[in-house]
Amino acid sequence: MATAVASQVAVSAPAGSDRGLRSSGIQGSNNISFSNKSWVGTTLAWESKATRPRHANKVLCMSVQQASESKVAVKPLDLESANEPPLNTYKPKEPYTATIVSVERIVGPKAPGETCHIVIDHGGNVPYWEGQSYGIIPPGENPKKPGAPHNVRLYSIASTRYGDSFDGRTTSLCVRRAVYYDPETGKEDPSKNGVCSNFLCNSKPGDKVKVTGPSGKIMLLPEEDPNATHIMIATGTGVAPFRGYLRRMFMEDVPKYRFGGLAWLFLGVANTDSLLYDEEFTSYLKQYPDNFRYDKALSREQKNKNAGKMYVQDKIEEYSDEIFKLLDGGAHIYFCGLKGMMPGIQDTLKKVAEQRGESWEQKLSQLKKNKQWHVEVY
């Protein structure tokens, strides 16, 4: 990605990040109140009926509470023809001006923060592959560099290369609004809120947005073997690239890629209201029970075996025998989300390896060498 890369680990910002605002005082806002789970809309808010894609009624995300019984045809298929992913088509000095299609809150009233699903129309001019990121330049002046624009913020893309409209013209982002609360007073300090996340979450259909990229190669979905196993571990908005993977595997009719392997998603969030794209993932369980597994770690609602809070590393430990066997068989494993999740996960994997009489350091080295290990944290 666009930041540091070391030992096959890319440290960058998945969807929902706002760089420079990662202090313990930052919390997601919860300033919209809903009485129940009817808080999601029924369709994506396209700018006009005249521009509404013909497949828009088949879009499946948290904004559409439905399941598609059959895969959706995509176009244009020449998006499959490139041998290498597009990289940095648009740079910060010459960004592409795209248009906001819709902004929808996708968490419930009890979620500790606000997360939005944002659809951007790039007109097919900024193509990307699953697992890549877009850079967003919010409007206004950089307070640290008078006269200069704000720095680019990276967001993992939450859609396939065809977008939620299946026509290759849109990109979806999953963005958590970053709000700063003074740790002493508990009051919000708007001057320290995340500039880019608030710009995106406050945007309206038709608003313009400056886009750079796409960037990143570490999280690209390996497609050489359509029967491979993919283990995906996410916290919060880190689920963004995995939504793209799963839509490509299970929702889209792509002649070049017929997935017949196993996709296993572990998603860690605070509570049920914080689950992202849950109905979409649940629909895959019903349609593809032999090819998809889905486990949730709800830290404020579930307990681990020691009666503590349930985190993704607890789920990994619970299924450790299966996970290690799958890794030994060549499975890919992906991590995306807050960087704070990695130490606990690494400790768990090391403990499990030792219980199996293995050296975790050697195993990790081999996984990286085999390009089975993919990490994107912020």
UniProtKB/Swiss-Prot annotation:
Residues 93-221 form the FAD-binding FR-type domain. One of its GO terms (molecular function) is ferredoxin-NADP+ reductase activity. It comes from Oryza sativa subsp. japonica (Rice). Induction: By nitrate. May play a key role in regulating the relative amounts of cyclic and non-cyclic electron flow to meet the demands of the plant for ATP and reducing power. Is involved in nitrate assimilation. SUPFAM superfamilies: Ferredoxin reductase-like, C-terminal NADP-linked domain, Riboflavin synthase domain-like. Its main location: plastid. Residues 1-27 are annotated as: Disordered. Pathway: Energy metabolism; photosynthesis. Its EC number is 1.18.1.2. Residues 1-17 have a biased composition (Low complexity). Keywords: Chloroplast, Electron transport, FAD, Flavoprotein, NADP, Oxidoreductase, Photosynthesis, Plastid, Transit peptide, Transport. It catalyses: 2 reduced [2Fe-2S]-[ferredoxin] + NADP(+) + H(+) = 2 oxidized [2Fe-2S]-[ferredoxin] + NADPH. FAD binds at residues 153-156, 174-176, 180, 195-197, 237. The lineage of its organism: Eukaryota, Viridiplantae, Streptophyta, Embryophyta, Tracheophyta. NADP(+) binds at residues 156, 176, 237, 269-270, 299-300, 309, 337-338, 376. Belongs to the ferredoxin--NADP reductase type 1 family. Its cofactor is FAD. Residues 1-62 form a transit peptide. It is found in: Plastid, Chloroplast. GO terms for cellular component: chloroplast; organelle membrane. One of its GO terms (biological process) is photosynthesis. This is Ferredoxin--NADP reductase, root isozyme, chloroplastic. Pfam families: NAD_binding_1.
